[in-house]
A protein has these predicted regions:
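An alpha-helical support segment within catalytic cores of ATP-dependent transferases
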Residues: 6-22, 94, 112-116, 124-190, ...
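Short, surface-exposed alpha-helical segments at coil->helix boundaries
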Residues: 8-12, 61, 236-239
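A general structural signal marking secondary-structure boundaries and capping sites
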Residues: 19, 68-71, 96, 125-133, ...
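ATP-binding pocket architecture of kinase catalytic cores
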Residues: 25-142
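Active-site acidic catalytic loop and adjacent metal/ATP-binding pocket
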Residues: 37-40, 47, 173-222
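Glycine-rich, phosphate-binding/catalytic loops in enzymes
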Residues: 64, 106-107, 204, 225-227
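Short strand-connecting beta-turns/loops that link adjacent beta-strands
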Residues: 83-85, 202-204, 260
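Helix-rich C-terminal or lid/interface subdomains of diverse kinases
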Residues: 113-117, 217-296
Length: 296
């Protein structure tokens, strides 16, 4: 609790130094994520403070400028930029994260509309940011080799569940093939999951998408894998809808394999904390994916 208060006071001081006329009546730490601290101010603004030096907020601003006014869903409009420290601030997009319980409560029609909204966002994003813009934006690919390295070192030979280990190794082979494949490359949004969307519970539609910090040049299969660990049915429906409107060919098996490897890598990351929630969640997600009878 004291750590959170200390962080909040630090962020408040940084903002007041840069914007002395900006009145901060309330401030709350929403999330301490993998790459950013996310703070809500006055119940109206969201401020993101990067944890790492390699978070390129200028690149995000360029991408959002390209998308502004040309995309169906709401996206962040940056109003505050850090002057001495790195951060951005924008008006909060109305909506809520999509929880598993919330998704389960939706009707079949609402689930289809949700999948359509996600697919349409990706279609518009890829259309407005074709691969030809990669050089202009100085975009590269993520480092995908760390996942196999972590799995080889901390998962293979240490996981006692032989059937689960075989499942991981089969998908690891597919993943290693995928990251060598230089065909069907796109500029990927690269972070589509339940916590980066503003969901309208009343209409069962998406209001907006945020966090554009992971945009990179990737094989198209990598664009969809994060949804698989959340809900395989939703992921499959998004892929189907995307294929329909874009005409692109996407292998559900390749997306699935990437999801398996990504989750298995988390077992490696938290291998020394087998009783932690993150380790147990990763293990349960893998068992859930392994239990699927069919894809697509």
């Amino acid at each position: 609790m004291k750590t959170n208060e200390s962080q909040i006071n630090k962020f408040k001081k940084i903002i007041k130094q840069d914007y002395p006329d900006f009145k901060i009546e309330s401030i709350k730490l929403l999330k301490a994520g993998w790459c950013n601290f996310v703070v809500e101010i006055n119940k109206t603004y969201i401020f993101r403070f990067p944890k790492k030096d390699d978070v390129d907020l200028d690149l995000e601003a360029k991408i959002l400028k390209i998308l502004k006014g040309r995309i169906t869903l709401e996206i962040p409009v940056y109003e505050f930029f850090g002057k001495k420290s790195s951060y951005v601030g924008y008006k909060k997009i109305t909506g809520q994260p999509l929880t598993a319980t919330l998704l389960k409560s939706l009707s079949l029609k609402s689930k289809q509309l949700l999948a359509s909204d996600m697919a349409n966002f990706l279609y518009e994003f890829h259309k407005l940011l074709p691969i030809t813009k990669a050089k202009q934006l100085n975009l590269g690919s993520d480092n995908h080799k760390w996942r196999p390295e972590v799995i080889q070192k901390y998962v293979i030979g240490k996981l006692r569940n032989k059937k689960l280990l075989d499942f991981i190794e089969i998908n690891l082979d597919k993943y290693l093939e995928l990251i060598k494949d230089k065909s069907n490359l796109i500029i990927a949004y690269n972070d589509l999951h339940q916590n980066n969307i503003a969901f309208n519970k009343k209409s069962s539609r998406l209001n907006g998408i945020f966090d554009f910090g992971d945009v990179a040049v990737e094989h198209i299969s990598i664009e969809f894998y994060r949804l698989f660990s959340f809900d395989p049915e939703l992921a499959t429906n998004v892929i189907k809808q995307y294929k329909k409107i874009s005409g692109r060919k996407i292998s559900v098996e390749r997306v699935f394999g990437t999801a398996v490897v990504s989750i298995a890598a988390m077992l490696g990351v938290y291998n020394r904390q087998p009783n932690s929630k993150k380790y147990k969640d990763a293990l349960n997600d893998l068992l859930r994916l392994k239990s699927l009878k069919r894809l697509g």
